[in-house]
Amino acid sequence: MQPLRRLMGLVTAAPLLALVAIAAAQDANIRQPIADLEQLLAAEPLVIAQAEISRPKAKGDITLRAIVSFGEAAPLLVKLRKAEPGADTFNNVPRYDIAAYGLQKLFLDPAEYVVPPTALRMVPLADFAKYSPGVARTFSAADQVLAVVQYWLNDIKVVADVYNPERFAADPVYARHIGQLNVLTYLIRHRDSNLGNFLLGNAETGARVFSIDHGVAFASLDSDRGT
């Protein structure tokens, strides 16, 4: 029980120094106000300007790294992931991604979100097919593709494990972020440890941690990669 109490203490403690570091990290990783990004991703007219497979060496990867225009705003770099027909296949359930994004709002302030701004959009099939040959309409009644649209984080890196025990013990702000990530992934029953699902900020102290893929969560079957 003692380790759990210690972790919860780190999660809830908020000294002034920690808040300053958190604000700095917010600017480094998510460079626009959360509310503005939510409006752009969810509601403004969407036009794909350029896109490519985000991990071309990963077999079967369907996630696009895309430059997208949203209305009159400057183009944004986003993650664009198509749903398969029916929008309910293993490791590709768009409603889980939007649910994970929304759930964190119950206990985290925007400056400490561990899931970057995320929305669901319907994209015309012809537009999506330019960058994803063979893509099919998600629902038979609409000539469109349901897609997860997620803000592409800045100043981050992929590591084998975002949790570092030594850093956790020495850096209270980093420890706080790890605790917040741990709480969310527990609540949503995140069960896919695939490399790249969790990202670490590049800040030397107070680095943020993020969860960007939630296809194997909630009521999903377990991943063969483990948890």
Model-derived regions: residue spans:
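Bacterial N-terminal signal peptides
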Residues: 9-20
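Short, intrinsically disordered, charge-balanced linker/junction segments flanking boundaries
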Residues: 22-25, 222-227
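Regulatory N- and C-terminal appendages and interdomain linkers associated
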Residues: 22-65
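A short, sequence-level motif marking secondary-structure junctions
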Residues: 80-86, 216-217, 224-225
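A broad structural signal for short, well-ordered beta-strand segments within beta-sheet-rich domains
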Residues: 46-52, 145, 178, 206
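N-terminal secretory signal peptides that target proteins for export/translocation
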Residues: 1-5
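Conserved ATP-binding subdomain of kinase catalytic cores across diverse folds
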Residues: 50-156
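Conserved kinase catalytic-core segment
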Residues: 101, 106-111, 156, 161-224
